[in-house]
UniProtKB/Swiss-Prot annotation:
Its cofactor is Mg(2+). InterPro entries: dsRBD_dom, RNase_III, RNase_III_dom, RNase_III_sf. Belongs to the ribonuclease III family. This is Ribonuclease 3. It catalyses: Endonucleolytic cleavage to 5'-phosphomonoester. The lineage of its organism: Bacteria, Pseudomonadati, Pseudomonadota, Gammaproteobacteria, Alteromonadales. The keyword tRNA processing applies. It holds the Pfam family Ribonucleas_3_3. The gene is rnc. Digests double-stranded RNA. Involved in the processing of primary rRNA transcript to yield the immediate precursors to the large and small rRNAs (23S and 16S). Processes some mRNAs, and tRNAs when they are encoded in the rRNA operon. Processes pre-crRNA and tracrRNA of type II CRISPR loci if present in the organism. Homodimer. Residues 7-129 form the RNase III domain. One of its GO terms (cellular component) is cytoplasm.
Amino acid sequence: MEPIKNLPRLCRTLGYEFNNIELLIQALTHRSAANKHNERLEFLGDSILSIAISDALYHQFPKATEGDLSRMRATLVKGDTLTIIAKEFKLGDYLYLGPGELKSGGFRRESILADAVEAIIGAVYLDADIEVCRKLLLSWYQERLAEIKPGINQKDPKTILQEYLQGFKKPLPDYQVVAVEGEAHDQTFTVECKISELDKVVTGVASSRRKAEQLAAAQVLELLNK
């Protein structure tokens, strides 16, 4: 757990500065750690995320059917996606957990990470308003919204790889940014993807970290399918 003094660093990562930092602390507090925990904020954030993503998809895909919109929304708000977002934000470093959860590695537990993302959404809403929260969510989901398309199969390479490894009870992939080149407005990211099933390290290179991770995951899947 990072000290409270380092929460401004998390705020910069999230792209939002809290007026009331206590709301962020509560959003990061698991029920095992204190009576004032994040479950109510999680409840609030879940609803806000759903309406924000529904609204974005409705306007982005004016010809999509209700079924396609529902499937795309489910892909974007499901626990696996929220867990990936949490790991991108390194939320596990900031969680307040009780001794039992801490000992059992709760800071890596996917359900706890996903719940913390929803709790932070609820905290932002209470700290500001629905419009500020909506704009923040759109910034978090910008690349995912750009990539998603109507259709039955909504799974991206990272999700497919994660589910494949989970099915065999194997460790999740380890993604590491090994190089960032270029100016701030025109950067190139190189990401390594390591899994226990392969001896070799696979890399992806793209204009964003997320895209590079997706490319690396896609290459790993190709190797696994050979």
